[in-house]
Amino acid sequence: MAPRIEAQEIETYWNIFSARTNGSKFLTGEQAAPVLKNSGLRDDQLERVWDLADVDNDGNLDFEEFCVAMRVIFDILNGEHADVPSTLPDWLVPESKAHLVQANRALTGKQVQFERVDDDPDSPGLKDGFDWYMSPADKSKYESIYQENRDMRGEVSFGALEDLYESLDVPDTDIRSAWNLINPSAGPTINKDACLAFLHILNYRHEGYRIPRTVPASLRASFERNKIDYQVDKQAASRWATKADDETSTGRKAKFGDQYLTRLGRGSFKTSGTDFSSAQTDSEWEEVRLKKQLAELDAKMASVEADAERRKGGKRDSKPALVKRELEQLLDYKRKQLREIEEGKTKGQGGGSLKGIQDDLQTVREQTDGLASHLRSRQQHLEELRRQIEDEKAGR
């Protein structure tokens, strides 16, 4: 199975990114430097990591590029790479920037060569030029078909679309070829992203284009990790600007699935807009702010320890006690938040689900436990410093 960035890993990167950008969509070199340097890599290595991750060469890192940089660093630290790789692995290339990577490889002579497949003599009259780009109108139609045929797990089987196949001018062999192309694991069902790609291939074949025989490496990795990012801000080819005509191939393409959707009563399907259900909640933002506060407290403690080390035998500094009080106050505050949530005193947004409240409770519990553990560790360290100071005094 191809490597991938797990959802938990992406969430960790998001917490770091959002805490540094303060609401901005980009991370500057100055903002990223402290995070990257904490890895312990040499400056020349970090420079090469930055060059790899900054795919669009704008001098900043957006969130996708920041994820790339962090994953490359962790792979080096974990021994996956002996040094910074000269090029990004295909599975790590952000789908929205794949065309930039391909263009750069072409200019530098490192273009990836895909297998060339000769024209199929059994398919005379078909056209070349299949395009993986989905126009917004096509994508909306694909999503409508998906919504009507998905199972309770959000997946679609090959047989669920039998009625659609009958309405298309596509041979059964080509339909199965398209299914196998987007289902490399040969599973009985495919998820939403793979289903959209499957319908897109059938759409092109319905218009008279050949079924693609191979998939670009970066896109193939996206199929394998069941996550595809379809960007609709790409410049469309000139043929999309022509007026639809039922007698032209473009007109036939526009009619893909219309008859099928009409039978389902979904001919006037409209998208409802972007789904922001996965947006960051207040508790998640609070977790980000808390982590930032803990980092600041750690820095204060490190400063106190350094002062104590320099002063060995001198007057005991009062800062450790102050830091301890700050940690205790922060811990008490989080415990109070937890009690309020459990008693139903917090003001949540209307319509919140029980699972969302349970997730918030679990997050606060984890924060509280982490703070308690951190406080105990700091107290032990503080006691050790005090013993060292007392030993120094006694030794004089």
From Swiss-Prot:
Biased segments, Basic and acidic residues type: 380-396
Compartment(s): Cell membrane; Endosome membrane; Cytoplasm, Cytoskeleton, Actin patch
Annotated signal peptide: none
CDD domains given in the database record: EH (cd00052)
GO biological process, one term: endocytosis
Example of a GO MF term: actin binding
Quaternary data: Component of the PAN1 actin cytoskeleton-regulatory complex.
Membrane topology of this protein: Peripheral membrane protein
Pfam families, per database record: EH (PF12763), End3 (PF12761)
Gene3D superfamilies in alphabetical order: EF-hand
GO cellular component terms given for this protein: actin cortical patch; endosome membrane; plasma membrane
Domain EH: 9-99, 138-226
Keywords assigned by UniProt, alphabetized: Actin-binding, Calcium, Cell membrane, Coiled coil, Cytoplasm, Cytoskeleton, Endocytosis, Endosome, Membrane, Metal-binding, Repeat
Protein name: Actin cytoskeleton-regulatory complex protein END3
Region (Disordered) location: 341-396
PROSITE patterns: EF_HAND_1 (PS00018), EF_HAND_2 (PS50222), EH (PS50031)
EF-hand domain segment(s): 41-76
SMART domains with a match to the protein in the record: EFh (SM00054), EH (SM00027)
Species in which this protein is naturally found: Pyricularia oryzae (strain 70-15 / ATCC MYA-4617 / FGSC 8958)
Coiled coil: 282-395
